[in-house]
Structures are given as C-alpha cells and as structure tokens.
UniProtKB/Swiss-Prot annotation:
Protein name: H-2 class II histocompatibility antigen, A-S beta chain
Family designation: Belongs to the MHC class II family.
Subcellular location, principal: membrane
Region entry Beta-2, spans: 121-214
Record PANTHER family: HLA CLASS II HISTOCOMPATIBILITY ANTIGEN, DQ BETA 1 CHAIN, MHC CLASS II-RELATED
Ig-like C1-type domain: residues covered: 123-211
Membrane topology of the entry: Single-pass type I membrane protein
High-level lineage: Eukaryota, Metazoa, Chordata, Craniata, Vertebrata
GO cellular component: early endosome; external side of plasma membrane; Golgi apparatus; membrane; MHC class II protein complex; multivesicular body; plasma membrane
Alphabetic keyword roster: Adaptive immunity, Disulfide bond, Glycoprotein, Immunity, Membrane, MHC II, Signal, Transmembrane, Transmembrane helix, Ubl conjugation
Superkingdom of origin organism: Eukaryota
Length: 263
C-alpha cells in the first residue's frame, strides 16, 4: 500500500518553485535563500479511534499558516498567512478535511503491520512497602508496573475493595529504551491488621485487569507464616530423602550370578 501525501502540498511546492525560478530571483538577488517547509502531522488515539490532522506551512523557519482538523479550517499564524488562509478555505477546505481519512487513516493502516504500532507487551506488577512494616504507623505502598507497551496505562489503588484517591501519587512515565515503559504509583497509608490493599492495572494488552494484593499483618504473624513455609519446605525435602533411601534398600545387595551361568 503506497503512502499518501496531502495534495495541497504539491500545489504549494509548485508555486514556490515558480517564484524561485522567476526572472526576479536571478541577478543581484541570486545569493538570497528562501526556504519553504510543510509539515503534515497525524495524531492517533487508540489506533484509529480518534485521529487529528495538523498541516503546518513554514517560510524561512516561521510558521505562517496552519490547518487543524479539530478547528476545521485554515488559520493564519502570521499576517503573511492571511491571504493564503482565505484562499485555501475557499478552494481546498473540503479536500483538506477529507485527508483525515485519505492520508492519516490510509497511511496508518498501510504501515501498522510493518511497525510496532500493533505491538502489545503485558505489564509486570509488583507491590512493595517503602519501610519495614509496622502496623498502625504511617507508611507507603509502591506498585511497580514495568515492561509494558504501548504507553497508555491506568493504575489504581483499592483498600478493602474501595478505591483510594487521597494519598496517591505517581512518577512520570519512564521509557526503558526498548520501546517498553514503567511507572511507579505510590499510596500513603497507615496499615491496620486485616486490611487488604490492591493495585489494579488496566492496559490495552490485557483482556482483563491485573490485580495484586497486599495484606497488612503484624511482625509475629509474618514470622509465623515464614516459619510455616520453611517447615513445609524442610518436610518435603526430608520426605523425598526418606523415599529415596527406602527405594534403594528395597533393591537389596547385588550378589554373584548363579554358578550354573559361569559354566
């Protein structure tokens, strides 16, 4: 699929070439330089769900005319662009409005299969506590959301099923340098026994949100839990060792072959 460019750009370029090649530009003025630039910009939200087109006309590094699809018409940026704005609005307005589809949408659909536009990377979500846990003392929970693409993401905090909006702060979106992003969303809180905090993450790569829970508990409860886990691990190790020894003992010692086989 061939990429499209705004047709009005070709007309403007022809006009500039005609001006620069006219007899008045030769002779004593030949050392002067005139630079005309055109910038066609397409902005996309959620794929092609919302598209914005902006055309910028620049003469000698100064923008003098602009078309913004959100405005719907040409607007002069400087006095130099006023005659062109009036003329283009009369002659080319409908054509330029249509380029939202004929240029922006067309080019998006043509290149998305060959670029990262369709890339989706699911985020990894981890909750951590900024300081050693102590019940009934002020603390901060940190929800680390990493390695996701595209950049659009929504992270919320819940306490016992109710969304928390007070005490929530976030870092700026951080680029990892490999087209993926990360962000930290903090919640200032005072943990109390039995409370459940949830980091809720929504992202285009997910069919359903990711939810990660953190439960407030005392140091003694944490120690008992860790002791229980350690005991279970040791139990599994000793059980496996016992089964291995039993299996070896059931085989019995290997003796010499029957005498008849040696003859």
């Amino acid at each position: 699929m061939a990429l499209q460019i705004p047709s009005l750009l070709l007309s403007a370029a022809v006009v500039v070439l005609m001006v620069l090649s006219s007899p008045g530009t030769e002779g004593g003025d030949s050392e002067r330089h005139f630079v005309f630039q055109f910038k066609g910009e397409c902005y996309f939200t959620n794929g092609t769900q919302r598209i914005r087109s902006v055309d910028r006309y620049i003469y000698n590094r100064e923008e003098y005319l602009r078309f913004d699809s959100d405005v719907g018409e040409y607007r002069a940026v400087t006095e130099l662009g006023r005659p062109d704005a009036e003329y283009y609005n009369k002659q080319y307005l409908e054509q330029t409005r249509a380029e939202l589809d004929t240029v922006c949408r067309h080019n998006y659909e043509g290149v998305e299969t060959h670029t990262s536009l369709r890339r989706l990377e699911q985020p990894n979500v981890v909750i951590s506590l900024s300081r050693t846990e102590a019940l009934n003392h002020h603390n901060t929970l940190v929800c680390s959301v990493t390695d996701f693409y595209p950049a659009k993401i929504k992270v919320r905090w819940f306490r016992n099923g109710q969304e928390e909006t007070v005490g929530v702060s976030s870092t700026q979106l951080i680029s990892n340098g490999d087209w993926t992003f990360q962000v930290l969303v903090m919640l200032e809180m005072t943990p109390r026994r039995g409370e459940v905090y949830t980091c809720h993450v929504e992202h285009p790569s997910l069919k359903s949100p990711i939810t990660v829970e953190w439960r407030a508990q005392s140091e003694s409860a944490r120690s008992k839990m860790l002791s229980g886990i350690g005991g279970c691990v040791l139990g599994v190790i000793f059980l496996g060792l016992g089964l291995f020894i039993r299996h070896r003992s059931q085989k019995g010692p290997r003796g010499p072959p029957p005498a008849g086989l040696l003859q």
